[in-house]
């Protein structure tokens, strides 16, 4: 996570670790399926999204980049368009260059 955080700082796309609370894991359980990806409550979407993804990445290092919030901006930076920002692309490229 530290390498990803540093990459984000280098390209002005900040990220940080968020906990996945056990309650959010429980909300991914379904009465009619193994899992569900939405609990009909519009709060904590990033954390609940990570709780859902966690079921598919057992035993590997992973990160959930929730880009919904920064995907569009009203006051774009010099490298952003006023439409979609592409948030996360620069971060991942910097991380891979490592």
PLM feature segments, named:
Residues 1-98:
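A generic structural signal for tightly packed, nonpolar segments enriched in small/aliphatic residues
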């Amino acid at each position: 996570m530290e390498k990803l955080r540093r990459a984000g700082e280098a390209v002005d796309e900040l990220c940080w670790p968020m906990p996945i609370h056990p309650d959010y894991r429980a909300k991914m359980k379904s009465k009619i399926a193994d899992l569900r990806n939405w609990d009909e409550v519009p709060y904590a979407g990033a954390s609940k999204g990570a709780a859902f993804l966690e079921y598919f990445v057992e035993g590997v290092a992973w990160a959930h980049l929730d880009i919904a919030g920064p995907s569009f901006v009203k006051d774009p930076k010099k490298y952003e368009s006023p439409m979609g920002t592409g948030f996360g692309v620069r971060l991942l490229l910097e991380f891979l260059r490592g």
